[in-house]
Curated annotation (Swiss-Prot):
Family listed: Belongs to the ABC transporter superfamily. Protein-1 exporter (TC 3.A.1.109) family.
Domain (Peptidase C39): residue spans on this chain: 1-126
Superkingdom of the source species: Bacteria
Quaternary structure annotation from Swiss-Prot or TrEMBL: Homodimer.
All residue ranges annotated as the ABC transporter domain in the record: 469-704
Record's catalysed reaction(s): ATP + H2O + proteinSide 1 = ADP + phosphate + proteinSide 2
Cellular-component GO terms for this entry: plasma membrane; type I protein secretion system complex
Keywords: ATP-binding, Cell inner membrane, Cell membrane, Membrane, Nucleotide-binding, Translocase, Transmembrane, Transmembrane helix, Transport
Domain notes: In LktB the peptidase C39 domain, the ATP-binding domain (NBD) and the transmembrane domain (TMD) are fused.
Protein name (Swiss-Prot/TrEMBL): Leukotoxin translocation ATP-binding protein LktB
Transmembrane spans: 159-179, 192-212, 270-290, 296-316, 389-409
Annotated compartments: Cell inner membrane
Domain annotation ABC transmembrane type-1: ranges: 155-437
Length: 708
């Protein structure tokens, strides 16, 4: 009745779903009590106030259909008749609109005509304050500005060194002019000796300062690189589990590897070339003093470089995008193949996998070749402009010398100065491909760094867990357009109770425990531990006090002791051994040559499946968690290993709340209570013998199947 009543107020339903989308928990009845004073549903004003009370930024706007693709989605389409719905995505290519029908509780795809018929031009845009902060801190090229400010002293020193280098670069052509126009004409050997010594000193200082500048600059950029690498890894581990479930491992790895491109760019010559280019204005002034005509030729060539770059850059960027996509596909396929090597060999499908790899590799090499060809065309275009300018300057300069407007020394000095101006431009043009690649890398890396993390700040860190668990009116789906996984689930688990959860595959058993670990927030309802809403709790505080053992557990490439004591490397050995004994792992560990110092190999490859599982159980027990979850934890064990664990189960469960998820009913038959789930709902609950008395029940049916 309560759900139907809430469904009648589509504004409240929309607010609940949008809050859940932004990882904010709410109690619909509390919102209704505070803001729906007349009982007729939330008005536009009360809806905006309710959103504000939840720390959501909501804005009512009027928008034409042709401009809907520009707004941040999902958004609420407000209807004066109360038939509100959510706009999730706009497909401009096919003129289709992905919406969510709040009344029917289902996603819908509307055509242009269908959408126009129900759209009244009113939208409510919703963002969370956390997402606004995330947008302000968006990772792009502006991310490096605070880093430059942080190391401004070092960059100032680099700037000062660059000034001296430019002064030396300015003096050298003047020496050559004096030699040509004065020394050679007047045969002044003493003057020549002085100039030669002075030039040698200038060259030595120039080499030393140039090396010093490169060292200081590389040192600074390396520190920025370390900061970026550390920030990236911390951010990656802080992302919600849904981020990883929706992306291929290889794609994520490929994006992280883009850090290498940024590193090479920062520590290369590109930024020092920019500094050199800034000082070109001084050289232009000196060159203008020598010959305005020749200077105009040099100035006239600069737009040619710029126009050529503008022409080539968009094409190059598109091809770099394609190259990255092919590289990411290869990375993902390689990771998938290595991970599934046992299956590939067992099914003898290596030829098919090799054929797929060859095709993907050929596609990558082809896209890489197109990038190389285009980059070569770009560089040769720059060389063509440079050579053309050199020929024009030679012809015009010779005419000026012949007419007496310019001396030979001045012409040589001018050409040397023009080289100092053009060289940074040439280097930047040749490094343009690197800059484009870095732009792609920043965008790809930004997909990781700009993804919202799990929110820890402002969450409650509560006292030690006792173990009371409550699921109230839980409704959950993994995506807005996905089917409902849990529907109106209500479950109370008392402190110290051992609960078994059984049911067919896909009935929602594991999803229930994911909500308990706060990997997700329910679309509707609350998950409480000791009366505290987990939506308001610090996830780290919660997960440190819950032990979890899955069917397929991952061990790190470390020693057995380090794997068991993963959460506390300084843990006393006695605690490690005690947990291993509880898990039935101590005996086989003691038989190993290195004992607890045995390296298990990547993902525990050096151990059998049963041994890996027992170490994982010991890892879950070592922190003495008040809540323990076994999610098909014993299904992969041999009967002897399972027997050892089941013998210790009473001691394992002592003083804890335990949730056992199993397909084998023998695993849960001694539980205090057994919960039977079907299609996201609890259909039966009771003790083993009580459930068997209902011959028409699902539990009795599953039990009979296993007996047969």
């Amino acid at each position: 009745m309560e759900a139907n009543h809430q469904r009648n107020d589509l504004g409240l339903v929309a607010l609940t779903m949008l809050a859940q989308y932004h990882n904010i928990s709410l109690n619909p009845e509390e919102i209704k009590h505070k803001f729906d004073l007349d009982g007729k549903g939330l008005s536009l004003t009360s809806w905006l106030l309710a959103a504000k009370s939840l720390a959501l930024k909501a804005k009512h706007i009027k928008k034409e259909i042709s401009r809907l693709h520009l707004v941040n989605l999902p958004a609420l389409v407000w209807q004066d008749n109360g038939k509100h719905f959510l706009l999730v995505k706009v497909d401009t290519d096919n003129n289709r609109y992905l919406t969510y029908n709040l009344e029917q509780d289902a996603p819908q795809i509307l055509s242009q005509d269908e959408f126009e018929a129900c759209y009244q031009g009113q939208l409510i845009l919703v963002t969370s304050r956390a997402s606004v902060v995330g947008q302000l801190a968006k990772f792009d090229f502006t991310w490096f500005i605070p880093a430059v400010i942080k190391y401004r002293k070092i960059f100032l020193e680099t700037l000062i060194v660059s000034i001296f280098l430019q002064i030396f670069a300015l003096i050298t052509p003047l020496f050559f002019q004096v030699v040509m126009d004065k020394v050679l004409v007047h045969r002044g050997f003493s003057t020549l000796n002085i100039i030669t010594v002075a030039l040698a000193i200038v060259i030595i200082f120039e080499i030393v300062l140039s090396g010093l500048r490169t060292y200081v600059f590389s040192h600074s950029t390396s520190r920025i690189d370390v900061e970026l690498g550390a920030k990236l890894f911390r951010h990656l581990l802080s992302l919600p589990i849904s981020y990883f479930e929706n992306r291929r491992v290889g794609d994520t790895v490929a994006r992280v590897r883009e850090l290498d491109q940024i590193r090479n760019f920062l520590t290369g010559q590109a930024l020092t070339s920019v500094l050199d280019l800034l000082f070109s204005f001084i050289f232009f002034a000196v060159m203008w003093y020598y010959s305005p005509k020749l200077t105009l030729v040099i100035l006239g060539s600069l737009p040619c470089y710029i126009l050529w770059s503008i022409f080539i850059s968009p094409i190059l960027r598109r091809r770099l995008d394609e190259k990255f996509a092919r590289s990411a596909d290869n990375q993902a396929f390689l990771v998938e193949s290595v991970t599934a090597i046992n299956m590939i060999k067992a099914m003898a499908v290596a030829p098919q996998m090799t054929d797929t790899w060859d095709k993907q590799l050929a596609s990558y090499v082809s896209s890489s070749f197109r990038v190389t060809v285009l980059a070569t065309i770009g560089q040769q275009g720059v060389q063509l402009i440079q050579k053309t300018v050199m020929v024009i300057n030679l012809w015009l300069g010779a005419h000026l010398v012949i007419s007496g407007d310019l001396s030979i020394g001045q012409l040589i000095a001018f050409n040397m100065l023009s080289g100092q101006v053009i060289a940074p431009v040439i280097r930047l043009a040749q490094l343009w491909q690197d800059f484009q690649q870095v732009g792609i890398s920043v965008t790809r890396l930004g997909d990781v760094l700009n993804s919202p993390t799990e929110q820890y700040q402002g969450k409650l860190s509560l006292p030690e867990i006792k173990g009371d668990i409550s699921f109230k009116n839980i409704r959950f789906r993994y995506k807005p357009d996905a089917p409902t996984i849990l529907n109106n689930v209500n479950l109370e688990i008392r402190q110290g109770e051992v609960i078994g959860i059984v049911g067919r595959s896909g009935s929602g058993k594991s999803t229930l425990t994911k909500l308990l670990q706060r990997f997700y927030i329910p679309e509707n309802g609350q998950v409480l531990i000791d009366g505290h809403d987990l939506a308001l709790a610090d996830p780290n505080w919660l997960r440190r006090q819950i032990g979890v053992v899955l069917q397929d557990n991952v061990l790190l490439n470390r020693s057995i002791r380090e794997n068991i004591a993963l959460s506390d490397p300084g843990m006393p050995m006695e605690r490690v051994i005690y947990a291993a004994k509880l898990a039935g792992a101590h005996d086989f560990i003691s038989e190993l040559r290195e004992g607890y110092n045995t390296i298990v190999g990547e993902q525990g490859a050096g151990l059998s499946g049963g041994q890996r599982q027992r170490i994982a159980i010991a890892r879950a027990l070592v922190n003495n968690p008040k809540i323990l979850i076994f999610d098909e934890a014993t299904s992969a064990l041999d009967y002897e290993s399972e027997h050892i664990i089941m013998q210790n189960m009473q001691k394992i469960c002592q003083g804890r709340t335990v949730i056992l998820i199993a397909h084998r009913l023998s695993t849960v038959k001694n539980a205090d209570r057994i919960i039977v789930m079907e299609k996201g709902e609890i259909v039966e609950q009771g003790k083993h013998h009580e459930l068997l008395q209902n011959s028409n029940g699902l539990y009795s049916y599953l039990h009979q199947l296993q007996l047969n």
